[in-house]
Amino acid sequence: MTADVAARRTVVTCPHCGKRNRVPSVADGVPRCGNCRHSLPWIAEAGEDDFAAVAERASIPVLVDFWATWCGPCRMVSPALEQLATERAGVIKLVKVDVDRAPALGQRFQIQAVPTLLVLRGGEVAARQAGAAPVAVLRRWLDDALTESKPSEKKEPS
């Protein structure tokens, strides 16, 4: 991991006390407000050079948003994803990947349409959702993905 990746930070306003906090893209555990100590929404951007450090090695489940600047549905679903990250502060990390800036990641994860959402658990894809959806649908999908066993723990039907 380069020093640039380790030093990259996002400013997040605490939904509990309103204090602005600098949250690193890469860290162990979950970010907490420096003022009130509540868990903060963890939202980061990643590209080809730092995706492994930011998303695949995260200590909590990661909701990955593959999006593009020219994509209308991507812009429509972005506030819903940020809402989910806020609702599940300390439980998930939201990582946004611009497919035009990271085409190799799009190929690697077989992204054929944007937006496409993935849930990574232990660095493995646990769930996939293509296309925009209302926040209630995304919330249910995310909750299902978070409650299922890890891909490596899934048992074959008998």
Please give the residue ranges for each predicted region.
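Short cysteine-rich clusters marking metal-coordination/redox-active sites
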Residues: 14-17, 33-36, 74
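A short beta-strand-turn-helix
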Residues: 44-62
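Thiol-based oxidoreductase modules, predominantly thioredoxin-like and allied folds used
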Residues: 46, 66, 78-104, 111
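Residues immediately within or flanking Cys/His clusters that coordinate Zn2+
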Residues: 11-12, 30, 68
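Cys/His-rich microdomains that often coordinate metals
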Residues: 21, 39-40, 78
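Non-catalytic, surface beta->alpha helical segment in thiol-disulfide oxidoreductase systems
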Residues: 113, 118-155
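Short pre-active-site segment immediately N-terminal to redox-active cysteine/selenocysteine motifs
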Residues: 59, 66-70, 113
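Short linker/helix segments within small regulatory modules
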Residues: 22-32
